[in-house]
Structure formats: C-alpha cells, structure tokens
Amino acid sequence: MLTKEFNFDLPEELIAQSPSEKRGGDRLLILDKQSGKLEDRLFTELPEILPKNALMVFNNSKVRHARIYAKSKTNAVCEFLMINPMRDSDGSLWQVMAKKAKRQKPGKTFLFEDGTEAEIIESEIPLESEFRCMKFNRVIDDEWLDKYGHMPLPPYIHRKDTQEDADRYQTVYAEIYGSIAAPTAGLHFTQEVLSKIRDKGIDIEYVTLHVGLGTFLPVRAEKIEDHKMHTEHFFISEKTAQAVEKAKKEGRPIIAVGTTTVRTLESAWDEKRKELKWGNQSTDIFIYPSYKFKLIDKLFTNFHTPESSLVMLVSALAGKENIFKAYRHAVEEKYKFFSYGDAMLIL
C-alpha cells in the first residue's frame, strides 16, 4: 500500500492555530464504522452518546516544556527539541532534534539564558540526520525545562507559544512528565465532562505512553509497509490491566481516548492468555490497514495530518473509505483539524 494513498486536500484555514475559546467547546463528528453514517454533534454531548457499560482508557502522560533556545558563539539563536535523556546518563546527556541541523556539528557550544552551557558531541549510537547528542554542564530535569523551556507546539501552528498553551496544550488529567507532544484527543476533556461520564456508570482508567518520535514523525517510505516506527515507552498499572481484562471478558465496549492509548493497549494485550501485560514496557507497533485489532473497537480521536501513521491507524480501525468520507465531510463542514482542532468518535 502506498503512503500517497493517505493524502488528502486540506485548506490551510482549517488547521487550528489556537485552542477553542473554552476547553471542551469543540465540535464532534461521529462515525459509525459499520454503516459509514456520519453525525455532527458537540463535544459537550459526548457523555450522552457513549454506551453506558463502556470502559474508557486515557493517556495521562504530561507534555514537557521541551522546546529550548540557546545562543551559539556567534550569538545566533538556535532552537532544539529535547527528545529524551540518553540511556545510562545522569540527566546531563540528551538526544535533541536540532532546527537547521546541518549547522549543528559536534564541538559546537551553546549558552542558555540561565548560564547553562551545552555542547554537541559525537553520539555512541547512530542517530538520524536531524538528531544530535547534546552534553550539558548540569543535570537537565523537568523543573529546569518548566522554567526555561517552551511548549513544543507542532510546526503547523505558525506562532510562538504563550502562557495559555502551558494550560491548553496539556490534558486536565496529565500526571507524569515525558511527552514531547500532547496526546491531543485528551485536550477536549474537562473535569465536568469526566464527572458526567463517571455519573453515567462508565469506568475510566489511565495508561501512560510518553508521546515521542514514533507518534509524530512523518511516514517517509513510499510503501507504508517499509515504514519503521520509533520506539516509545509506556506504563500500565495492575489496576488498569485488571479493569481492561474484566471489560474484555464481559464483552463491554473498550473506548480508547487517542491513538497513543490504542497503540499502548494493542501492544500489551496477550491474545492467548487474554491478559493485559502491566508494568513498564515499550512499543514500536505500526497500525495500518490489514491490522487485526485484538482489544479496541471504539476510538475518540482528533483529525490527523495527511500521510501520517495516525491517519493510517484510524483507517485500519474504521476502514479507509469511511475515514476519507468522514474527512471530506469535515472539510466541507469546516471542522478544525489537528492538535487544537475538533474531535471525532469512531463507534
């Protein structure tokens, strides 16, 4: 299957540049994957739409203030995205994504606003062209990033981050730092909507998948079967595992909130034992049409970028024809797309 088959036309003005005025003030497109029927609703109506006996699973990873700026020796301002600390380092050695990467060669040094210094060094492991290994003269932790870093808004949002983004590019239930992009399906949810969902008798559980390169890097291969996902790390508690196993055994609907939750649950499910493996794990699962889902058959998600692994995942779940019909409808009805855009519920 060719990557270009997952391309679609999207007017620039439908790419949301800011969140809705109020969290949860978004539109909701419902897709019945069996019939292909579409229904235009509001996100605030979600609790009344969801099946009563469902289990909803959310990703509670918290977005790092991972975009940082520094000055080079020539006083040029340079931008980096802090991906993750290098394995076995004390927190002073990080894998970073460099803007204008060709200029950032080993030996180049940088100065940050608080006086922290860093140097690009040769990596002991192979890195792709835009990535670098950066050695700091101190431990870099989330406390430092909170103070000196910026929210890593995606490149299709053509503005600098603001104080509002520190709140709105984070879910209300985010708990554990580690993501370099928001698990965006969750951005719609307010505490009020979550309470209404619980009041309806729907169970809510959480997993933690730290959104990394696997989620947001483009599919560069001509054939999707040749695409390799970057590894992302996740955690499932014993409590969540037991709740998922119980729902599966009882034949209740399991609704994933976001594609990261889908990838987490599908990766951890042991079909033979009918068990969800719990604890710290990692995944490079790539879900595209022809994938047979083991656990998930319903999904709350956003509208995704053309030719992305995410639009391939939703096509695997609902059928490519259904998804592209829904996306054409969304364009015609002027739904907002991507991270700060409107939502979609696949039933």
From Swiss-Prot:
Q: Does the keyword S-adenosyl-L-methionine apply?
A: yes
Q: Which reaction does it catalyse?
A: 7-aminomethyl-7-carbaguanosine(34) in tRNA + S-adenosyl-L-methionine = epoxyqueuosine(34) in tRNA + adenine + L-methionine + 2 H(+)
What is its pathway?
Answer: tRNA modification; tRNA-queuosine biosynthesis
For this record, the Gene Ontology CC terms, alphabetical, are: cytoplasm
One GO biological process term is: tRNA wobble guanine modification
- Name where it mostly resides: cytoplasm
Any one GO MF term held by the record is:
S-adenosylmethionine:tRNA ribosyltransferase-isomerase activity
Is Zinc among the key words of this record?
no
**Cited Pfam families:** Queuosine_synth
Query: What subcellular locations does the record give?
Result: Cytoplasm
Q: What is its EC number?
A: 2.4.99.17
Keyword set for this entry? Cytoplasm, Queuosine biosynthesis, S-adenosyl-L-methionine, Transferase
What's the stated role of this polypeptide?
Transfers and isomerizes the ribose moiety from AdoMet to the 7-aminomethyl group of 7-deazaguanine (preQ1-tRNA) to give epoxyqueuosine (oQ-tRNA).
The record describes its quaternary structure and partners as: Monomer.
Per its UniProt record, what HAMAP family does this chain match? QueA
The record's family statement is: Belongs to the QueA family.
Stated name of the protein: S-adenosylmethionine:tRNA ribosyltransferase-isomerase
By which gene is this protein encoded?
queA
